[in-house]
């Protein structure tokens, strides 16, 4: 009777604790069965040596120390068990507090990162909206990859503005790496930079190199960018020019149908994950007086 009451109460307390613990392991049920089996054996052993007082079961936060206390006191070890019981409870409370604090900090960190991400996305969109080019004005926005270009194209379409990709020396160069092994092209951010040559030439160290992210094992030494190294590095468009009237490169140069990308002009969700990028707003006439087309892009006239 006493044994069954204790087991029942212990299981109820354990179920309450399990509800407070997040991310419960999938094998917890099997683990619970093992615990119950061990508890039954322990309680049976204690009860066989010194019968357990049923009144003990009314105590709040009952544990095995309470069941073993009469047995310990009978042999002069009660003080030791009380001290050990206090220390175990204290350690349990500390672990629970630390776990709750970790969960709280992790949740706050996730919320903060989410807020910062959403804030940055909104900032880029708000920046563009607050710098909408009027007649005779253009906005030149730095774009480092195809996803960012798509976002700026969509914004321009949304406001019925013309847009065109270009390469201009207002911003740092953007590179595309074409792998001759698998035929895929990737932007710089997608490439895998490494300095461990052990998988290529064990024991050798020649500096950093990059590998194709498609795992075709093609690589290139970053110091010389040998065009015959299996991966070709090419300068790509690094900006988008947007306005009612814009300077135009040839369609052959841009390799795209003028002003059409097959995008939904209302889908501004493409700004998700788009970071804040540098931009400049200027008069179209000033642009023609300061920049000149060269090598499929634009350069400052006084820098030639």
From Swiss-Prot:
Q: Which key words tag this protein in UniProt?
A: Coiled coil
**From which domain of life does this come?**
Viruses
Q: Which residues form a coiled coil?
A: 3-35, 89-132
Q: Give positions of region: Disordered.
A: 96-121
Q: What is this protein called?
A: Uncharacterized protein L531
Source species? Acanthamoeba polyphaga mimivirus
């Amino acid at each position: 009777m006493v044994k069954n009451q204790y087991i029942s109460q212990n299981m109820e307390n354990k179920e309450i604790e399990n509800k407070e613990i997040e991310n419960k392991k999938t094998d917890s049920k099997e683990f619970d069965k093992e615990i119950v089996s061990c508890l039954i054996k322990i309680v049976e052993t204690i009860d066989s040596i010194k019968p357990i007082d049923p009144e003990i079961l009314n105590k709040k936060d009952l544990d095995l120390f309470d069941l073993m206390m009469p047995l310990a006191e009978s042999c002069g070890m009660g003080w030791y068990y009380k001290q050990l019981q206090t220390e175990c409870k204290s350690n349990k409370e500390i672990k629970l507090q630390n776990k709750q604090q970790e969960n709280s900090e992790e949740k706050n960190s996730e919320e903060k990162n989410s807020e910062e991400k959403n804030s940055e996305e909104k900032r880029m969109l708000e920046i563009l909206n607050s710098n909408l080019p009027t007649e005779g004005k253009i906005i030149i926005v730095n774009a480092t990859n195809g996803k960012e270009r798509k976002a700026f194209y969509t914004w321009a379409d949304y406001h019925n503005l013309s847009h065109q990709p270009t390469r201009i020396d207002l911003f740092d160069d953007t590179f595309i790496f074409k792998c001759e092994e698998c035929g895929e092209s990737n932007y710089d951010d997608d490439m895998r930079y490494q300095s461990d040559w052990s998988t290529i030439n064990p024991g050798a160290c020649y500096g950093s190199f990059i590998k194709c992210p498609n795992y075709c094992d093609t690589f290139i030494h970053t110091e010389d960018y040998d065009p015959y190294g299996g991966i070709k590095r090419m300068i790509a468009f690094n900006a988008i020019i947007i306005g009612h009237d814009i300077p135009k490169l040839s369609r052959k140069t841009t390799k795209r149908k003028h002003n059409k990308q097959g995008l939904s002009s209302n889908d501004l969700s493409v700004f998700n994950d788009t970071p804040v990028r540098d931009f400049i707003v200027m008069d179209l006439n000033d642009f023609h007086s300061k920049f000149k087309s060269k090598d499929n892009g634009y350069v400052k006239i006084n820098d030639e």
